[in-house]
Amino acid sequence: MQSRHIVARLSCAAFFAGAPFVQLNAQTGSAAAAALRHGIRLDDVESAAVERGEVIVRVLPTQDQRDVAVFGVVRLAVTRDAYLRRVQDFRNWLHTPTRTGFGLFSDPAVAADVENVVVSRDDAKDLRNCRAGDCTTKLPATEMLRVQSEVDFSARDVQSRVTAIARLRMLQYVGEYRDHGNASMPVYDDRPSMRASDAFAAVLAQSAYLNQAAPAVSAYFRTFPRGRPAGISDVLYWSEDAVARLRPILSISHAVVYTPPEVAGTTVVASKQIYANHYFEAALEVMSVSDRDVSGEPAATYVVIERRFRFDNLPKGGILNIRGRAVNGLRDQMRDDMQREKSAAERLGTR
């Protein structure tokens, strides 16, 4: 069972957690106010820690045992505009240190976009025995059969043949998604059949911040390719994340950057998982980038991130306590990611 190996080193694309939305009554330039935009109350100790430049991370409650939700906040000693210039350099910003592979998709997607995609030897080999309800790779049953009919698993070029099929299918996924949106997201038959679009809809429905403070982004993710907000920037990309003791996670995601006119001084950056070959049925990450505007003090920026992963299976308790280990790993990963991002942003901001 894949989920038995989910451990603290897990890193991949992510989620926004559904805490109740709280209306802002605090000073706009405070750490508490930035967190309240996400429905998270910081106590005085946490607020003071953020102002000192420390990263604050919390694990949040979820409605489904398979979901993991993590919240983090940090203050950057750079302006919002300076930080957003870094973020909107998608090719560099999205290619994080944990990623062993990455590429942006052209519009329309072309073969060169996926020329660096390589299916691992283990994944390629295991497809030989895949069947509906029992497969180590997340695929529709029709694609399991296609691979088995087109690949000679006794040949020496199994990995390259499976990789060629995967590259073509990724281009098809992107083209279909651009034309038809969520309705074209894959059906996963590695376990009992489920639609990736249904899992994502469940995650999106719990995103109180995105739905109430940035409803245009929520609606865009729900109705894409319709309803594109004016001024939004978006990109589709693939990534492969290396995870110790786990199979490499190959995924396709849709990222957007948007400054809602109804939320002064804040830009929203969100990422939606379209496909992942292991572990995740759905993932969503929402980051808000807000001005810290305090009279007499240097300009700074609050970055608040909320992530959710919906796993295919995440048992809790017992000797293994898979859920507990996954939660701890994702919490630690959030802290590491935010500390690294703070260091990189402030280093670039001083140039």
Regions picked out by a protein language model, each given a short descriptive name:
Residues 86-89:
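A short alpha-helix/helix-coil micro-patch that ends at or immediately precedes a cysteine
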Residues 6, 14-15, 71, 277:
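Generic detector of short alpha-helix boundary/capping microenvironments
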Residues 17-25:
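C-terminal segment of classical bacterial N-terminal signal peptides
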Residues 1-12, 21:
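Bacterial N-terminal signal peptides that target proteins for export
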Residues 27-76, 80-82, 92-93, 97-351:
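Terminal "cap-and-tail" regions of soluble proteins that handle hydrophobic small molecules
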